[in-house]
Amino acid sequence: YTFLKGPIVIYGVEEVVHDLKTHVFNNKIWPDFTQIPLPDGSEPTLKFVTVEEGVPFEVLGLQITPIFVNHPVVCTGLLVDDGETTLAFTSDTYRTDRFWAEAGKMPNLKAVFVDVSFPSTEEALAERSGHLTPHSLSEELVKLAAEPLIFAVHIKPFFRTAVIKELSALGNPRIEVANINREYFF
């Protein structure tokens, strides 16, 4: 807090910003940091910026486009473009169409970081909770009109070994498990 040089900025679609203000930063669950100034008093500690689904916005020179995905609560995947390379992040999602269609339109799509939380034996749980399995991922990738690298993320720790084994069994050399301690360059 004392080292912040500006407010922490949270970007989100209207529904997400509303829910964060109503249910988290409400002085019951967590302080309303939009009302707490930085130590120098210049600005609030926290700032929300509402963005529109499908409409690019800029952060630090990057064009970011939020795309709604299929999840029990409002969630967006992100297309992030620096003018030379596009990366896609599904966020929490189950089977979805628009995200893959929009990602596939990006001429410089280099990688997709995709939620693969459960093994295929837990397909019913994955569907109810809005996440992919290796099997559903393989079916989803057919929708992608590009062949970027695919990095599996958000693997539930209890199922990590099974998910990794199943991803390997897919035999797709473009798919790997993202490493938390690795920096990726594209």
Model-predicted regions and their roles:
Residues 1-40:
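Active-site HxH/HxHxD metal-binding segment of metal-dependent hydrolases
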Residues 5-9, 85-87, 148-149:
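Short active-site oxyanion
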Residues 6, 37-47, 60, 146, ...:
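A short helix-to-beta-strand connector/capping loop
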Residues 9-13, 89, 153:
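Active-site-adjacent beta-strand anchor residues
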Residues 12, 48-50, 66, 152, ...:
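Structural signal for conserved beta-strand scaffold positions within catalytic alpha/beta enzyme cores
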Residues 15, 69, 155:
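Hydrophobic pocket-lining residues within nucleotide cofactor-binding pockets
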Residues 41-102, 184-186:
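Core dinuclear metal-dependent hydrolase active-site scaffold
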Residues 94-185:
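Cap/insert and terminal regions of metallo-dependent hydrolase folds
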